[in-house]
Amino acid sequence: MKIIKLEKQMGDFHLNIAEMNLEPGLIHGLVGANGCGKTTLSKLILGILSPDSGTIDYEGLTARDITMTSQKPYLLHDTVYQNLIYPLKIRGIRPDEAEVDRWLSRCGLLEKKMQYARSLSSGEQQKLSFIRALIFEPKLVIVDETLSNLDPDSTELFEELMLEQQKERPITWITISHQLVHIKKICDKVHFLEKGMQIAEGTPEEILLRPEHPLIQRFLANTEVSYQKQEQSLADLS
């Protein structure tokens, strides 16, 4: 997928992506401070928003090939099972019951298959939302802050699922996260946004470990200070 001269004005915010290459089959990380345009860009890619100008070359992908998971799981008022097979039903795909059970078992939800989704914990709802996005074998998955409120075990599970799917078939991932440990661990390529513009792209090592751009250096320094304050607060509580 290639983005060229993409612009979107929303109030005082102006997204202006001169060029961005989202190579197929890779895990791409969108990084930057709050309000830099990460979610706006993802909505433009999904077609939820229309650009004011510029182009997104999907290189053969259609809306049926693209899906998204977000920080808030949007689930049907129905059972876990019906939620999971919903993407299959709307695409006219007959559910493979063994495959459905495999996904549920992988996330520890098999015994809750016929329970209503609203009875699940918030973490379990997030797991259900995540595997629902994968069950129909999409070609592009956008993960928008899905991991932000998860415990370490659930975060590790999601990362394992992403890497497993990457090996099984060539999915293109776009993951948006403030968890730089996650970005460093799982991404093939990082795109750094600042005030609606992409100011750098490269490997996690190039962007997050050896950044040349002063704005990225400052962002990483501020992030490190924030982490240190959190650790000190936890130490004070213990």
Segment roles from a protein language model:
Residues 116-120:
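Conserved ABC ATPase signature
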Residues 177-178:
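H-loop/switch region of ABC-family ATPase nucleotide-binding domains
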Residues 46:
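Helix-to-loop junction immediately C-terminal to a conserved catalytic motif
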Residues 97-112:
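Conserved ABC ATPase "signature" region
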Residues 183-185:
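A short, surface-exposed alpha-helical micro-motif characterized by mixed small hydrophobic
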Residues 31-33:
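The feature captures the beta-strand-to-loop junction immediately N-terminal to the Walker
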